[in-house]
Structures are given as C-alpha cells and as structure tokens.
Amino acid sequence: MKIQEGFAAEGRLPKVELHHTELAIIGGGLSGVCTAITAARKGVKVVLVQDRPVLGGNSSSEVRLWILGATSHLGNNNRWSREGGVVDEILVENTYRNKEGNSLIFDAVLLDKVIAEPNITLLLNTAVYEVDKKEDDTIASVKGFCSQNSTEYIIHAPLFCDASGDGIVGFLSGAAFRMGAEKKEEFGEKFAPTEEYGELLGHSMYFYTKDTGRPVKYTAPAFAMDVSKGVPKFKKFNAKEHGCQLWWLEHGGRMDTVHDTEQIKWDLWKVIYGAWDYIKNSGNFPEAETMTLEWVGTIPGKRESRRFEGDYMLRQQDIVEQREHDDAVAYGGWSIDLHPADGVFSEKPGCNQWHAKGVYQIPYRCLYSKNIKNLFLGGRLISATHVAFASTRVMATAAHIGQAIGMAAYIAKEKQYLYPRDILTKGFVPDLQHELLKTGQHIPKLVLQDEKDLVQQAALTASSSFELAAFDADFALPIDTAVAQMLPLEAGSVPDITVEVDVKEDTSLQVELRTSSRAGNYTPDVTLEIQSIPLAKGRRKVKLSFSATMPERAYAFLTFHKNSALSLFRTRTRVTGILTAFNLINKAVSNFGKQTPPEDIGMEAFEFWCPQRRPDGHNLALQIEPALTPFGVEQIKTGVYRPTTAPNAWVAAMEDFAPQLKISWEEPQKIRQIDLFFDTDYDHPMESVLMGHPEDVMAFCVRNYKIVDDEGRVVFEKEGNYQSMNRIELEEPVTTSALTIIVDHPSANVPASLFSVRCYN
C-alpha cells in the first residue's frame, strides 16, 4: 500500500469512529471489568474504554498490586467473606491458572474474560478527554483518543459508568465531587484525620528483583535519591521484600493527586532507584550481590483523588456499627485504612488501620451521581467520606460494587431505560438485589427467594448427609497460640464435646465457650462459659459439658487458652463450614492479636481470631454428643451460597462412596438451565499477584460430577471443575420428573458439598 498526499492548508483531522451502545464504561480496572462482564452477560451492549494497554488498573502488570477486599489477607474476623459473582470467578480462575501470582498471566486472565463476552466492545489505549451533554444534568456522549491507532472514538449511550479512578467523566460533566478529608463535625466521624496527619492518600510504585546466580553490579542513575538521608524509614528496605510488599513506598498525599501525578511518579522513581542502590551498594546486604532489578513500575498506583457525591455518603459509622440499608447491593470488609500524607517521607507508621467486627453493607444510593442523571459511580469514585473511602477503596470491594452497577444497568434497560436514581425511587431495588443474588453476589442479611427456581417446589433426598459426631485424632500440636474450634450450633443447649490432649507436665486446660454479639459476625466477643480443668501428665480425653445455652443459631467458638505444656490432637479432615481460628498476629493488616483503639476515635476494641492458611489450620480432633446435623439436603434451598450463621450446604458423609442428591417433582418439568454452587473456600483471600498459593483448586471444591434424569440418562457431566458457580445451559431442554446429581468427594479427607442447585425452564 502506498499513500502520498500533498499539502493540506486547512490541516487534517484524525479518523473518527462512532459507537452507539447501551452502557459506556470509562475505566478498565477491576471495577470497570466486573461492571462490563456483569452487564454484558445480561444482554446489555457495553463499550469498555481503558486508557492503558491492559486491563486491571492497579492489579495489572503495570502496577502489580494484589487484589484484596473483605478477607484482608485472612487477618481479620470476616469469615467466608471473599467477594462473590464475577470477581470471584476471576480470582478463582487466576488461582487455577496462576497460583504463583504472575502479574502477566493475570493480565491474560482479565483479557480472556472480557473478550469472551460478545456484548462488550473493548477499546484499549483510549483516553476519554471530552464529555458532551444533551442537558445540564444528562450526558449524551464521550470522546476518547487512541494514540496507538490515531483514532478518535465518540461513544453515545443512555447510561455511563465512570470507573476511571480520577473520575474524568464525572469531572468533565460537572458532577459534584470532593477531594481531601471531611471535618469530623460534618458526619460525626471521630476518626476524621487532622491536617497534620494528612487528608489524602498518596500513590505507590513498586519494583521486582531476581537472583541471577552470579555477581551483578548496579550504578544508580543520577536522579536517584540517597534514601539513607531522605527516607526516615530507610532501614526497612531489604533484599527479601519487593513488589507490593513495599506498599509503604507512597507519596503525593500533600499534592494534587490528579494533576501532579507525573511529578509524584518522578519522586517515587528517585526513591526506588535510590533504595536499590542502598540494598546493592551499602554493604548491609551481601545476599544482594547476585541480585538485579527485574522490573520497576512506570505508572503510579493511585489510592485516592476525587470522590463523587451520590444520594448518600457512606461514613465511618456505617462501617463500624455495620448499619443496615434497605438498598444494600454490595459489602465491604477491609479495615478503615488511612495513611500519613507524607508517605515514605514520614516518620509515622505507613498506615493507621482499624477493623470493624464484621462486614458492612454498601447501599445503592452511593453508586450514582446526585447531579448527573445517567452517571454511575464505580470503583474508588463512589459516594463516601474520606474515612469510609479508606475501607471501600480496595479492589475486590470496588469490583463487587461494579457488579451491582452492571446489574443496575440491566434493570434500567429492562424497565425502558430508567436513570440510575429511578431504580431506587420507582421501587426496583428488590429486583436489583434479586438478580445480584442469583449470580452468587453475597449481600449480608439478604437471601435469594426465587419463585422461578423449580428446586424450591421439589422434594429432596440424598444418599447421605454428613453428621459431625467425631473427628479422628491424626496428630497433636502444642497450644502455642490460643485456638478455637468454630462449630455451627442451634439455639438452646450446647452438646457435650470431648477433646484429646497430650499433657507434658501437670497443668490446667483453660476453656471458654464464646459466640458473637451480632448475628452473622465471627468476632467471639461474648463469653458464655469458662472452665478450668486440672490435668496430670499423659495422654487423655477430656469431656466438656456446658450449662450455658446458645442465645440463637450461630457459630460457637470453643476456645483453648495458650499453654505450651498441652498439645491438642488435630484431624486431617476438612469440612465445608467447619474450621479453627487462632488468636494470631498479622502485622500486614495491623492485627496484633487484639485491637485496642484510643477512646476518642469511634472504633471498637476486640480480639482477632483468624484461620491459618492451608496446609495448616487443621480442625481439632473431637467427639460431639449429640452430633451436629446442619448439613442436610434441605440446605440447598436456603438461597445463600456460603456459610453465614450455619454452613448453608449439603455435605455428603465421608463414608458414602457415591454421594448423590436427588431432586424430585410430582409432575415432569421442562428444564433448560441448571445452576450449581460449589465451595471454593470463601475464606481464602486469593491474592492475585506475588504472594502465591499452595493449591490451584480449593480443597472443598467438587471436581467431578454428573447429572442424570429420571431414566438414568446423563444430562450433563463435568470433570475437573474448579469454579464456584457452574451454569449449565442445555442445548435441548430435558423433560423429567427427577434429576440426580452424582458427585465425587474432592479428596480422601474432604467430603463433597454443594451450596445450591437451581433449575429453570
């Protein structure tokens, strides 16, 4: 091809491409991605505009921050709190493909998920720079430019979602926004920071290192800083930590975190290259002689800039008090996590985290602009105070919010293109909640009640159901850390529990029976009974009988005080909804075993009881009389797809070598779709990069199953499952009076389980 053009006195214009769509999403971070996929799967035509070459934002290979949310590195009391829906699907997929946490592979996981959706048009490397409005309060279109193909895109849509991080669409459209911290008097937030501490969170950039196996020299660039003089905490640098383990490499909280970003980047580069000079050339790290820099970030990962105003602003009290909202569509659970504005140049600790006792609801009213009729607010732009934002800002929470927005766009379309606020004012929030729950999106305190689900009218039987009568004693471990066996109990009397101990010397076994003061929480802040049992040296069984009663259906914590003279026997058996928790320390999330805040900051004091990551974290060997039986087949009708106040799962007996669940109807039913929900361990955080995981498939997940009709014909069969939700859309509907689901146990130590089965015509 040959092109030759003469002089054009009037100049030239770039190529222009028009798009007319139903939802335009600006921002391809995790929130934008989950918004797009959720909407697209419901039939909404989506244009997803991302100004970077890859998707994922701060989770991408350009920044390399791990994805976290309510699970908080398994360092808080939020059990089974990993976010559901599309973000769960992504994290489970990434763990399966990429358990080592390679950020480049995670890029590919996100790209795969997006391009698999025919209703999504993806525009990468495209920066939106202009908004056109048809009225003062209504956006008509946005313009973006892609420097890679020199093309201008004009995107028209009835609905827009700004998930851009800095809020370019909201800003250009004139929507009300805030930057900086509110005074404590405005919302009654006692944790509102002082100007001296700082009113903005800064940016971070990271670096990766590798050992080459041979000496490598390093000459720092001229712009590198002498960190021993410029960084007060320079001695924290070491040859072992890299990537987002250096989250405290933060700067910009005293600057304009939108318009000063390029200068902030240069300032962070000075620190990074200076830090590596210190590690390589100070002589303090001889192990660094053979190490080299493998990667340095080229764009900052942003924490905070603009926050936009919706019909409600989430605040500190919503999080700490776990306030309930009729329009709840998502939840959070990260700590309220403020950082000193001076960041890496501050002598203060890099963060100031305070946890709530459990997860909190996020209302729909926070997810759209109060000024611009057709603008959703996604990601870190949602309507929240600076203090509340310190919790909602993390990526898994932002993604969960994005899924609510994507589903809201579907509801708006189905109801003849409502505006976002109309979903609230015209009474469609229950429809929104219903559709979200169907996807596996957990909303605390809500359960799915689906009249179209044929299973709800069916009779259920199973070849067996697990009963927790005893766990075998496989090995013993000393009680070096206080440990609690979490057990799902009904209201009323507490069963007798027998444990097995090995006593090194005469001592006493200190036992407490605890539960939570709030239904659905897992903070054992209520002590029901205390026992002290004298024990002589030797191995023996100890029977615990309690006079206390459980006030309601909930998890009880059978807690054993730290005592190195005692070893408790453990089992290798793991069961859905049954686990141990430990009074552990996790400094990464400011968990020091107990949270003891100052009296005047509006936070609560409590102990942390957290599981250990596999392969650790074994259940205690115990005997229970009468046996616990919350694992029956009726659990698949509960409308909840994770443990809450009970396991909420059918669990087969371990000795059942061919577990089967049968669904029967009085009359034959025509079935086109079957939804199955398996246990992928919602307690496991599934950090997306760097950290790595011991498994690529979660220990509780059923790998192999088949579904047969009333004549024994196989309707569907799957081997090698690893996902939470399996949606089976049959090419031809099956007419049958029964379906039988036959499952294999995940392993010899884990019985098969199933949270839910749904069937639709």
Q: For each of these PLM feature ranges, what is it?
A:
Residues 2-4, 10-20, 38, 44-45, ...:
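Conserved N-terminal/central alpha/beta ligand/cofactor-binding core
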Residues 3-5, 10-13, 58, 140-141, ...:
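Flavin (FAD/FMN)-binding glycine-rich loop and adjacent Rossmann-like elements that form
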Residues 17-29:
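Beta1/beta-strand and adjacent pyrophosphate-binding region of the FAD-binding site
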Residues 32:
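N-terminal Rossmann-fold NAD(P) dinucleotide-binding loop
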Residues 53, 562-564, 745-747:
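Surface-exposed loop/turn motifs at beta-strand-loop junctions within extracellular Ig-like
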Residues 486, 498-501, 506-520, 576, ...:
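Aromatic, loop-rich ligand-recognition surfaces of beta-strand-rich domains
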Residues 554-562, 739-743:
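Short, aromatic- and glycine-rich surface loops/edge beta-strands on solvent-exposed regions
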Residues 577-654:
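PGST-rich, cysteine-poor low-complexity/disordered linker and tail segments that act as flexible spacers
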